[in-house]
Amino acid sequence: MNSSGKVLILGASGGIGGEVARRLVADNWQVRALKRGARMRDPEDGIQWIAGDALDGGQVAAAAAGCDVIVHAVNPPGYRHWRQQVLPMLRNTLQAAERQRALVVLPGTVYNYGQDAFPLIAEEAAQQPVTRKGAIRVAMELALEDYVQRGGRALIVRAGDFFGPRAGNNWFSQGLVKPGQLPRIISYPGAIGVGHQWAWLPDVAATIAALLARRRELEPFARFHMQGHWDPDGSEMSQAIQRVVARYGGRAVVKSFPWWLVKLAAPFNATLREMVEMHYLWRLPVRLRNDKLVDFLGAEPHTPLDSAVYQTLQGLGCLPAGAINQEAGEA
């Protein structure tokens, strides 16, 4: 069977990068992944793991040799060192892409936008960030635009808050539930009655894969927004968790996330300071329009919420092994 193409993924050990890698392997791409440290993964996963650092331009360029696409899904861990590392890593990606004439894929965020763009955001909405992290994301997209003006090609797929069975660095797994145990408390960060947008990572990966399958039809600087799972009043995600937990004989209570405690500790911790900066995204409804995506693909890849939540909780070790799913009657 012929390959769909060759792709280098930066950040393949993370949530979105890992899901995209697995999806592209399934779609018969030749997938390379750059990762600090050697022999980090099973070679039977279909991915060619290459030891290297996204901050080393030479290593990125060597890993990208012969690639049609580079997926830039790498970030500094947590909220740390964004100012020092994010743009240098992207510069290395763009320099490597320019040598290979490769399409660069960037998973986008809503951090780019301020309240002037809320509540319903289309691809052409003005980007006027109100946080330091948002300003860096805008700078990243401007760098991509500059790359396109020099003859390159870029694709941005923007989605809501990520969650998924293999993702640990997100609000679902670090806020709503605690990995490794059946949820008893759901710690919800949002305001009551305020809508919030979620994106299941396998659906995001499927969307990126579908767009890459038609990459020759894309405009040079292609931007698409996903709808994902829109929670109109902030209760549907918590209720979905409760339903899955109940199927395993548990009971989960929804409580408010302790923002007061985060704000109290924020002066002493950089990660917590950044979390407080992003609090506005939980106080206001922020929704991405997916009209353009649907027009292009015909439909957005979409897994029903309860199924997505079930698979996520299972992947996070929140559902006890060997327990009986009381609704399905199976382990």
Model-derived segments and spans:
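N-terminal Rossmann NAD(P)H-binding glycine-rich loop of SDR-like oxidoreductase domains
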Residues: 7-27
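NAD(P)H-binding glycine-rich loop region in Rossmannoid oxidoreductase-like domains
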Residues: 37-100
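Conserved Rossmann-fold NAD(P)-dependent oxidoreductase catalytic core, especially the SDR/UDP-sugar
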Residues: 90-139, 155
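Conserved beta-loop-beta element that borders a ligand/cofactor-binding pocket
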Residues: 109, 142-166
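Glycine/proline-rich active-site loop of Rossmann-fold NAD(P)-dependent oxidoreductases
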Residues: 138, 164-176, 211-224
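Glycine-rich "substrate-gating" loop/helix at the edge of Rossmann-like oxidoreductase active sites
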Residues: 160-170, 190-202, 212, 228
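A conserved pocket-lining segment of Rossmann-fold NAD(P)-dependent short-chain dehydrogenase/reductase
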Residues: 178-199, 210, 219
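Mid/C-terminal beta-alpha module of Rossmann-like enzyme folds, strongest
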Residues: 207-275, 296, 303-331
